[in-house]
Amino acid sequence: MGEKESGDAGEAQRERILRAAALVMAERGFDAARMRDVARGAGVSIGLLQHYFDTRDLLFREAFEWSIGELIARWRKGASAEPDPWRRFELLVRELADDPDLQRRCATWTEFCASAARRPELRDGVRRAHQDWRELVLGIAESGVAAGKFVPVVPTDVAVRSVLAAVDGCDMAVASGSGMGAEGYAAVILATARSVLGVRD
């Protein structure tokens, strides 16, 4: 087991730990996740984990926020150059659905939300993630309305919240092993958004 690294190598090591922690949390749940499993998955010692994260709860909270933040960054990068609002939204949904870690990401999000219902100290992380999602989708919706390409059937904010609720529902379906795959995941979210945003062809 190596020592704590610095600079770019240190950031890569920290990301490897967070990725391993997100996977452990998805598999075991927040309350049952153990640092020894993270250490094994990341190929580091428990002592090294404690250099980066003072407590177990801090490690798993940061793993959750890293998991969501990584996805939102990929969303923004993947669609930032697309001028058409609906096409931009489609690209974002494909980025979600085609994630090779779709099962892990959905399970992590679902588990963290369930844990936040029992543990108030986790709720800020869930609220921040929801706010980031909302701002991203709201920006696309407002662009579509301004361009005359979207005519929402309900107030725009309600339409956006409906889309986010569809994403949450699809995440739960994937996490629970209900049989929903990437194509079904994308189809449900796109159909919901097209309906509530009043997308004009």
Place the predicted regions along the sequence by residue:
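Short coil/turn segments at alpha/beta junctions that flank glycine-rich nucleotide-binding fingerprints
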Residues: E27-D31, E82, A147
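Generic hydrophobic, amphipathic alpha-helix propensity
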Residues: Q13-A21, V38, A63-S67, L71, ...
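Residues in soluble alpha-helical coiled-coils and helical-bundle/repeat scaffolds
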Residues: D54-L58, S80-P83, A97, D101, ...
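Helix-turn-helix
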Residues: R16, L23-L58, E62
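Hydrophobic/aromatic-rich alpha-helical bundle segments in the mid-to-C-terminal region
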Residues: L122-R127, Q131, V145-R194, R200-D201
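Amphipathic alpha-helical segments used for helix-helix packing
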Residues: R87-R88, D101-D124
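N-terminal intrinsically disordered/low-complexity leader segments
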Residues: M1-A12, R19, D201
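Hydrophobic alpha-helical connector segments
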Residues: E62, A73-C106, T156-V163, A186
